[in-house]
Amino acid sequence: IQLWSTVDLPSTQTPLYMLVLYALIFFCGWGLSRGANLQKYFFKKDPTKTYLGIVPETITDGNRTLLVNGFWGLSRHINYLGEILMATGIILCVGHPTMLWPWLYPLYYVVLLFPRQIDDDKRCAAKYGALWQQYLTKVPYRIIPGIY
């Protein structure tokens, strides 16, 4: 897809500050995705251990425990936002912002992950019951903190 974006491009050079911005978008996405997945991994290994200096805050029903702070306190699927930002950062760096073809890559993640989040929430509601409802009040945003 990236090679298709180079066909018939104007020969303008992207300014350095824009390349830095594009790289920041990618690395913010990488930090969200990798950081959230690592926090979940370490929490499952030892629920009392801190991660990046953050003491885990949880809710429990006695049998099950859900993490409600750190990355997972920002939104219920913050790692999905990270994946979308990484794809966007890659396209901005290697594609041309005005070409359509490269944008299919981040659009693929949006089309894949937004419906998947709805399915994940349904599965979690069935699995955790009342605990999930309590979790929804603690972490109201689905993917994008403060927006959705």
Where are these regions (language model features)?
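Hydrophobic transmembrane alpha-helices
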Residues: 1-148
